[in-house]
């Protein structure tokens, strides 16, 4: 990934991590969630911040299977930026994935019942994705992913971080890892861990 503010190192990254000993990179890139997605640092619609999506095509060195993965972080303020950003992202996933199995991850700053997430998962939309939580037969952990370093009461914590899949990926396990050591937090979000095949 690259920094969202300048396309180099400045600002937040929406990086993708992979095991180099397991996968070869076939192609990769990034685009901004804006009206000008190829312009580095462009801010979209009513967004408060620049937002970026990073993607990669990987080949498994063991099975030779290929996969497409994308990671993003939708705007926390602009509703239009989230809606338009997700439409752009779905178009790009469709265009770039070449029919490969797809994994999309990120902080969508949207709860499951929001119009943004409904658009992503709407089966009437040919570009739709499947929520890994809904697809998994094994689900563990809480139903929330954002806690603001423990400041939000348990019953008010929202689920805003997602893993979506498409094109034949089977979700074996889905979990939100909410355990902390000595009440310490590494982030204001909890990790979402998904096992697919």
Residue ranges and their predicted role:
Residues 59, 88-95:
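A generic secondary-structure signal
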Residues 33, 72-74, 169:
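Hydrophobic pocket-lining residues within nucleotide cofactor-binding pockets
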Residues 14-16, 53-57, 71, 162-163, ...:
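Conserved hydrophobic/aromatic beta-strand scaffold that supports enzyme active sites
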Residues 5-8, 75-77, 109-111:
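Short histidine/acidic/glycine/proline-rich micro-motifs that form metal-
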Residues 72-74, 106-108, 190:
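Active-site metal-binding loops of divalent metal-dependent hydrolases
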Residues 72-76, 82-85, 89:
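Hydrophobic, aromatic-enriched interface-forming segments
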Residues 22, 80, 84, 93-102, ...:
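Metal-dependent phosphoester-hydrolase catalytic domains
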Residues 1-66, 176:
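Structured beta-strand-rich core segments of catalytic domains in phosphoester-bond hydrolases
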């Amino acid at each position: 990934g690259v920094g969202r503010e300048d396309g180099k190192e400045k600002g937040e990254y929406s990086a993708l991590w992979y095991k180099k000993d397991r996968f070869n990179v076939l192609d990769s890139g990034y685009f901004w969630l804006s009206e000008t997605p190829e312009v580095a640092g462009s801010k979209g619609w009513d967004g408060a911040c620049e937002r970026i999506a990073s993607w990669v095509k990987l080949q498994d060195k063991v099975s030779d299977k290929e996969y497409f993965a994308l990671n993003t972080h939708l705007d926390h303020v602009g509703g239009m930026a989230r809606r338009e950003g997700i439409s752009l992202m779905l178009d790009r996933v469709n265009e770039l994935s070449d029919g490969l199995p797809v994994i999309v991850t990120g902080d969508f700053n949207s709860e499951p019942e929001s119009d943004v997430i409904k658009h992503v998962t709407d089966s009437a939309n040919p570009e739709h994705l499947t929520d890994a939580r809904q697809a998994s037969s094994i689900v563990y952990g809480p139903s929330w992913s954002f806690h603001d370093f423990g400041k939000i009461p348990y019953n008010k914590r929202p689920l805003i971080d997602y893993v979506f899949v498409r094109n034949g990926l089977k979700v074996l396990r889905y979990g939100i890892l909410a355990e902390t050591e000595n009440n310490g937090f590494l982030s204001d979000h909890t990790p979402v861990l998904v096992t697919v095949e």
